[in-house]
Regions:
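Subset of outer-membrane beta-barrel
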Residues: 1-214
Length: 214
């Protein structure tokens, strides 16, 4: 949700790219549709990191049913001291349309304790498509993703306000050099179009190397 940092280390390391991340436990914060393209039936993770002398704690996970339906949830805090912490809860459902495309729905609730204190609610729609390619003995894939966030978002309390609505789209290419080694190249562009004061464009690019010994 608006105002609380994404706790996924992979997302931060990849330039803030969320729409085309591959399946992991933090899919609820990025793109829950991605979880349906992973090998694992379920994943759970927890983490913490410090940003600007403030600490974020988080926990998230998902579970797949029949490899076609996915339920995901996540919780995070953004800390000032032990008593003053912004908190959020995120829930998501994703459905796999076919071998290539999956869609997701998200709902977010956040409790802010800063100068603009109050409760924030919003919803989102996500999509991801994975197109596989054969390269001789090796496998590669093109991932395309999109995400509309902040739908119906508002912050109640003394400083009632609408939350930013943004659309993001990205692409990633997975290049599997062998069964153990892989490279991922990704890029994403995000446009915030409402309200006018928050309007703007931002983007990110990233590269990831993966080593699998299992």
């Amino acid at each position: 949700p608006y105002g609380i940092a994404n706790p996924d280390a992979r997302t931060l390391g990849m330039g803030g790219i969320e729409t085309v991340t591959s399946a992991d436990a933090y899919a609820v914060f990025n793109n829950p549709a991605a979880g349906l393209f992973g090998r694992q039936k379920a994943q759970v993770a927890t983490s913490f990191f410090t940003l600007s002398d403030k600490t974020t704690y988080s926990a998230a996970g998902y579970y797949k049913f029949n490899m076609q339906h996915l339920l995901a949830g996540g919780w995070r805090t953004f800390g000032f001291d032990e008593r003053l912490k912004d908190k959020s809860v995120s829930l998501a459902y994703a459905y796999r349309l076919n071998d290539i495309v999956a869609l997701g729905l998200t709902a977010d609730y956040a409790r802010f304790v800063r100068e603009r204190s109050g409760n924030a609610f919003s919803a989102g729609i996500t999509a991801q498509a994975v197109v596989p390619f054969e390269r001789g003995e090796n496998y590669s894939a093109l991932r395309l993703g999109a995400k509309l966030t902040g739908i119906g978002g508002f912050l109640d309390g003394p400083a009632e306000m609408k939350l930013p609505v943004a659309f993001a789209a990205g692409a990633a290419y997975d290049l599997f050099l062998s069964d153990a080694h892989a490279l991922t190249f990704a890029g994403e562009c995000r446009y915030t179009f409402s309200p006018v004061a928050a309007r703007g464009v931002e983007g990110g690019i990233g590269m990831e190397y993966s080593l699998s010994l299992i």
